[in-house]
Amino acid sequence: MASSDGKPGGVFDHHVQTAVCDSRAKYREGRRPRAVKVYTINLESQYLLIQGVPAVGAMKELVERFALYGAIEQYNALDEYPAEDFTEVYLIKFVKLQSARVAKKKMDEQSFFGGLLHVCYAPEFETVEETRKKLQERKAYITRVTKNQDCYMAKKKPVPEQKGTKDSRQGFHPPMPGFGTAALNTSPESPPENSSSCLPYSCEFPLSCFASKSTCSRGEHVDRVSDSCNSARNHGELSRHRDHSAFSPKLQMNTYKNSVPCSSVQEAIATSQAVGRFMPRTTQLQERKRRRDCDRELGTLLETHTSSNEVLIGPKLPGIPTVDLQDDSLNTTATLIRRKLKEVISSVPKPPEDNIKDVCTSHPGKQRRRI
């Protein structure tokens, strides 16, 4: 910064008002002609220098105008600062830097008691401690903003798809060479089809054997292995029975999920299913409406089908007693009327339950007044 006398109260280059930019594009011109100037954190400051204030003793009104944009810590008049005739120069210090930014933007080139104000930053009045604090606050702000942007970019990255669940389970449960061969030799009569290939571990090796291998004796170990072999046979029978049953694949997946002992594997499966099951809210509502319509149409079709081929079970209820009118002509007319009433009653469609609920919950229509 160049100064005329090198003192804080002198005129610096950044105090001089910059000329209006005449090379700005037409579509970028605003209501007021402005200059192009870039401010760094070193040039910005809590101290504002107000030039062009009329010398009519309006310091109180000036401070009140600037106090609208933030708390003011101190203010004073600069008598030694060179100014035009019949004008004064004031120095105002804001508590926050953002308040000084807003006040400079709003009050620069504003009319005040017949004069045109010129507001600029005055960082030369800052102490070393104030400058250090200003730079630290700016550094913390930049760190916070960049961290938020990094988190946002990390959220936008696509989630990598899970590979085959079989590979992931093998990674979670590594093979144990010594114990596995011994257990295989102890159960030669168990058929190979009993071992389920969809499980993350062999049915012949329960987790209790792995957990208690170091604490149990050899006899206890053999007993547990034999118990595990029996449970493996039972599991093979259950699996064969399940194959012949009419359960859906989704139900089998749920039973498998309950049998998986590793919580991390369950979380991975749950996350993969949640990703595949995600749908927008509007799509869910449309799907529900479509299902309701399909169920309604299916119900009407079933009703018409059962009415056409009605199967009576149990004793037949007594019908409407026919009244003898003592006249053949009247009896024929009454029979025709009863038959017509039955046709009308049977042809009336049953309103769906959704429409009944809508009619009940909706407010009654307001009647129009007759004038």
UniProtKB/Swiss-Prot annotation:
InterPro entries xref list: RBD_domain_sf (IPR035979), RBM48 (IPR039599), RBM48_RRM (IPR034264)
Annotated segments matching region Disordered: 157-191, 348-371
GO molecular function, one term: RNA binding
Alphabetized UniProt keyword annotations: mRNA processing, mRNA splicing, RNA-binding, Spliceosome
Domain of life: Eukaryota
Biological processes annotated in GO: mRNA processing; RNA splicing
One Gene Ontology term, aspect cellular component: nucleoplasm
Chain ranges of the RRM domain: 46-124
Basic and acidic residues bias locations: 158-170
Entries under PANTHER family matching the protein: RNA-BINDING PROTEIN 48
Function: As a component of the minor spliceosome, involved in the splicing of U12-type introns in pre-mRNAs.
Subunit structure and binding partners: Component of the minor spliceosome. Within this complex, interacts with ARMC7 and PRPF8/PRP8.
Annotated family: Belongs to the RBM48 family.
Protein name: RNA-binding protein 48
Classification lineage: Eukaryota, Metazoa, Chordata, Craniata, Vertebrata
Gene behind the chain: Rbm48
